[in-house]
Structures are given as structure tokens and as C-alpha cells.
UniProtKB/Swiss-Prot annotation:
UniProt biotechnology annotation: Compounds in the chrodrimanin family such as chrodrimanin A or verruculide A exhibit strong inhibitory activities against protein tyrosine phosphatase 1B (PTP1B) and therefore, they could potentially be developed into drugs for the treatment of type 2 diabetes or obesity. Furthermore, chrodrimanin B, the end product of the pathway involving chrodrimanin A or verruculide A, does not exhibit the PTP1B inhibitory activity, while it functions as a potent blocker of insect GABA-gated chloride channels.
This protein's name: MFS-type transporter cdmB
Organism annotation: Talaromyces verruculosus
Residue ranges with Basic and acidic residues bias: 49-67
Superkingdom to which the source organism belongs: Eukaryota
Key words, A-Z: Glycoprotein, Membrane, Transmembrane, Transmembrane helix, Transport
Membrane topology, record value: Multi-pass membrane protein
UniProt lineage: Eukaryota, Fungi, Dikarya, Ascomycota, Pezizomycotina
Amino acid sequence: MQENPKDLACLSELPADSPSHGGIQASPDLESTPHDISPDQDNYQLPPKQEERVESVSVKEDAKDLEDGGPEYPSSWKLAVIMLGLCFAVFCMALDNTIIATAIPTITDEFNSLDDIGWYGSAYLFTTCSLTLVFGKLYTFYSIKWVYLIAILVFEVGSVVCGATPNSVGLILGRAIAGLGGAGIFSGSMLIIAQTMPLERRPICTGLLGGLYGVAGVAGPLMGGAFTEYVTWRWCFYINIPFGAVTALFILCFFKAPKPIRKTSSIREQLAQLDLLGLLFFIPAIVSILLALQWGGTQYAWGNGRIIGLFVTFGVLILIFIGIQWKKQETATVNPRLVKDRNVSGAAFYCLCLTGSFIVFTYYLPLWFQSIKDVSATKSGIMNLPTILGVVICTILSSGFVSGLGYYTPFMYIAPVVASVGAGLLSTLQVHSGHAEWIGYQALYGIGLGFGMSQPMVVVQAVLAPADVPTGTAIITFMQSIGGAIFVSVAQNVFNNLLLQRLAQDAPTADAAMIAATGATSLQSVVPQNLLPSVLEAYNSAITQAFYVGVALAAVSILGALPLQWISVKGKKIEAGA
């Protein structure tokens, strides 16, 4: 599959200083006579201090593309094989976020490790969130193919450690290692898509991977429960090994490695470009905020010195990190120039809010089903399917519309409106709400999410210069991870506080501490029958109040769409650093 060389001329449709050019101005010669470009002629007029970031976009390479009829993409069957491998990798990486949830009771029984429960999930989350931006730099300076394969290898090693561990410490270590590899899988998959097809076809494939990410969120607890009940909990991690191996084989054999986007010579120069000083402050800052959110209101009161200390540590470290980024500019982990780009910052905020809303409902809808409708964890996952089907179907449909129409911005307006209406209706659920309500409300919410969840990735590929696409992709991926982590903790604290308040009002004679500590699936079996109606009302109120966090996020996400430019993905020669 090749692009038409005349498609280069469409770059001139945008103002020379437009962010969509990534700072690259097209000369009159390039605009008028693209076929007359000499390999030795410099036709790019670059703003000051931006020559380094477009090293790979040389005139010689552009001229060669023109002579050859455009960049070469893999054949249809090779592309299908590559996409299958990417789907396996993204599904397993996303699956690891939730698959352990239903296996934790069995694991704690085997290892006698009740105090370590929080670390089983957070160890994976800490390394994933902390190192996502690091992979953005690695993909910029080294071969996308080999960095991606290393990420897969590290993820596989972590999975093996988790599955084979003889104790709780080994499981926590394995989760951290798997998270380290997982940090590079999603953004790397998006960059491989950018290397294997023209821009106008990418929305469909990015939408497919985004839909799989959502499916994995719900499939995780179902698969974890099935493995734990019928085989062993260790297969929650062993399942990653064959899929990861197939992905590595497909990428190794069928993905043609592009040249690094920026070339560096000496080891010293490479270390300087990786911004190790910035990472020295960024990683502990992220760990501090995640620990504060995980412990606050659960293990420790919000006013506890540990929680306050973690928030203060986060604030100090992140301010130092921002200062380092401002000083380093082009060699920073997060280039300030990208943050100031209204398209990138808007897409990042949009992704933060919409993904945060999705994760809140992914966690708390099953809780509503288990506690109020008295179903098992497996059945609650099945009852959550209307949301997931809505997300997957509309993600693929909207991605196809973007490829056909060329514009992603309209769908980024539609998504918050529809999703916030669906989320608002879900927050009205009552103890006696029937199938029509919880199915219909979920479907509407999922449809809204599907229109918008994959679009931020399209934005950064459409508006950024090739050398900036890996960093832009990493920013969006980081926002996905951190958004879920932050807002689930916010919803958890809303739920905990409201539950205790409502129990005191509606069921003052009930043992509030015992009810709060009881799992959702055991609620109706441990509460006395004479108190059960009042307790269910209190539980329902607390959960739907937690839903308000997801409602607010869905509504506020539209603010991220407002600054976006209306840029078409059709007919543009924009590559991710080929």
C-alpha cells in the first residue's frame, strides 16, 4: 500500500506556523512543483532551535519517497499478521490490569499474605505509569521494532516470575517487572501502526486496539475467576506467554524496522537525550501520588502524616521535574513545546477524563451488580457487557467514519455529550431497577465512549512532526494510565465515606464496620434480613454517588475537544519517523 506523492502538496493547505505542521514550513517550490525537488535542495524553512527534531525528515528522504511513489507499506496479508500480533500484545497488557482481581482471595490464602493485597495491583500500575514517558524517548532515538520487542520480552519475564513465584514477594516483583514491559507495549503498538499504513487508514486500527483495551478490562476478572476455579491462579500470568511469543515472532518476521527518528552518536549524547535527571524526579513523584491515593482514606486517614508527606513529596518533585523540562526544552522527556500545542494538550486532557470515567464505571458497575442484584463476580462481568459492546462497536464504527470523512473532531464532541447522558442515567439506578434500565443506560454510555476513546491517538499522529509522534503517543498513553489510577481512588473514597454516612442514617443498628469490610458478593448473606432493605438502600446510594465521579469526568472531557483544530487525516503524508 503506497501513498500518492502528490499528497505532499496538501501540507501547504495549513498555515506555515500551524501546529499541524509540527513547525515545518513548506516552501513555494515544494507547494507548486513537488516533482522538481532535487535531492540536494533544502526546501524546509525551520523555526529556530527545531532543526534537531526533524533530522530524519531530510530532503533526500522526501525526494526519494517522491521518486519511488511514496513510502512502502507492507502487503495486506503482512499487515493482517502484524495487526494480529499487536492485538495479542495490547489485550494481554490490558488484561493484566484486572485479571488478578478475582484471583486475589485464593492467592492470599496460599501465601498467607492478606497485608500484601494492595501491592499485587499497585506494583504493576506504578511501573506502567512511571515508565510510559521513558519509552516515548526510547522510541524516538532507537529502532521502534527492537524497543518494542524488548518491552514484550520484559513483560513476558514478569509474567513468568508471577506464575512461578513461591511467595508473595516474588509475585509483587513479577508484577513490577511486567508493568515495566507493559509501559512500552500500547504506545509501541500505536507507533507500529503509524509505520505500516497511511494516516487516513490508521483510525480504524487504533480504534480496534482501543476497543480491545476496553474488552480486556471486563474480560480480566472473568478469565481470572475461571482460571482460579478450574485450573490454577498461576494461569492468570502464564496465559501471557504464548500470546507474547506469537506477537514477538510476527513483529520480528513481518515488520520492517524503520530508521530511528533521531540519530545520536556517543553514549554520553544518548544519555543526555534520555533526560535521566528529569526521570530521577518524575518516577518517584508518580509513585508518591499513586501511593497517597491508594492509602488515603483506606489504610490511613487523609490527615495522616504519611499521606500528607506523600502529597508534599509529589508536589515538590513534580515542580522540580517541570523546571528541568523547561530548561532542557528539545531534549526534555516532555518537550514544553508539545505541551503548549493546543491539539496535544487538548487531546491529553480529553483522554485523561474520558478514560478516567470509563475506569470508574468498569470498577463500580460490577460492584453494584454484586451487592444490589446479588450475583457472582463472573455474572457481574457478563452483566457489564452492554457497556463494553457499545465501546467496541462504536469505536470501530467511529474510526471507520474518521477514515472516510477525514475529520476526528466532530466525534470528540459527540462522545462527551452521549457518554455523560448515559453516565448520568446510570447514577439514577435504584435497588429495584430492572433489566431495561441497566442495559439501556450502559449501552448509551458505551456508545458515547466508543465515539471518542480512540481519537486522541489520531490527533497526535495527525498534528505532530514525525520526530514528535513517539513522545506525543507516550503522553496520551500516560494520561490513560494515570487517569484510571487517580479517579478510581477518588471514587473509592466517595464510596467509602458515603457508605458509612448512609448506614448511620438508614440502618443505625447495623454493624457499619462489618458491612464496609464485607465483600460485595457476601453482603446479602451476612446482613440480617430485617436490616437488609435499609443496608441495600445505603449501599446503592454510596455506589451511585461514586458514579457521579464518572459522570463529571465524561461531561468535563468536552473541554479537551474545544481547542482542537479541524484537521483532515485524508491525503496527508504524515509518518511516524520512517
